[in-house]
């Protein structure tokens, strides 16, 4: 993937940097693998806003992604590389030898015509899915299961990968993209390689409208609100916070306050927290 940098022809192109999409080989998705995608836009079942700054955006159709990779022993051929509006990684359409078609996350350097395989004993090639205990130390992996047979849950964003640091008994030590070091069961599956689109973090919208197309609404500072709307609000002109520390709109400590539960069960598997 490559990034196109725009000159300031108009205010909308100033500071714009967008994907070129030169790696895509197909523009229309596979009809059997798409579904309607009803988005809640930050509302709960009562219509109350529970997550702010969401709403609008372009209509999307959801692509069914195979995160489990449970076609064990059945070889698949990469038929096309496609765009997915629901994630910043590219997806690959796989044609299996038994006739089934599935979408997977495209690993970096996996191209049309390449062959992939899942299951124990598969070759150590990019795009193949194996149990963690069969993947060598130092390998880059993605789409990692946390619970066996549940499907990949972590390391799925564009350009991300985890690294295998050690193997000890029933657990494998991984270093995640967040620098967190975590233990995972050796029976869990993972895919070899790095997720495609490693330049996704370089994209800059250049204008507010492009961000609205993604379904993101504006964020208003608490200091410009009224005191009935935010703890930072009120005062004459540009007033200081007036509190000992920054607070959320609901009066909870903000900016640096750790929000993870102190006695969460998964703490036993985290050797070092993310930095």
UniProtKB/Swiss-Prot annotation:
Location(s) in or outside the cell: Plastid, Chloroplast
Pfam families: Ribosomal_L2 (PF00181), Ribosomal_L2_C (PF03947)
Region (Disordered): 219-254
Alphabetic keyword roster: Chloroplast, Plastid, Ribonucleoprotein, Ribosomal protein
Main location: plastid
Gene Ontology MF term list: rRNA binding; structural constituent of ribosome; transferase activity
Listed GO biological process terms: mitochondrial translation
SUPFAM superfamilies given in the database record: Nucleic acid-binding proteins, Translation proteins SH3-like domain
One term under GO cellular component: chloroplast
Highest rank taxon of the organism: Eukaryota
Entry-linked InterPro entries: NA-bd_OB-fold, Rib_uL2_dom2, Ribosomal_uL2, Ribosomal_uL2_bac/org-type, Ribosomal_uL2_C, Ribosomal_uL2_CS, Ribosomal_uL2_dom3, Ribosomal_uL2_RNA-bd_dom
Assigned protein family: Belongs to the universal ribosomal protein uL2 family.
NCBIfam families: rplB_bact
Quaternary data: Part of the 50S ribosomal subunit.
PANTHER family: LARGE RIBOSOMAL SUBUNIT PROTEIN UL2M (PTHR13691:SF5), RIBOSOMAL PROTEIN L2 (PTHR13691)
Protein name listed in UniProt: Large ribosomal subunit protein uL2c
Origin species: Phaeodactylum tricornutum (strain CCAP 1055/1)
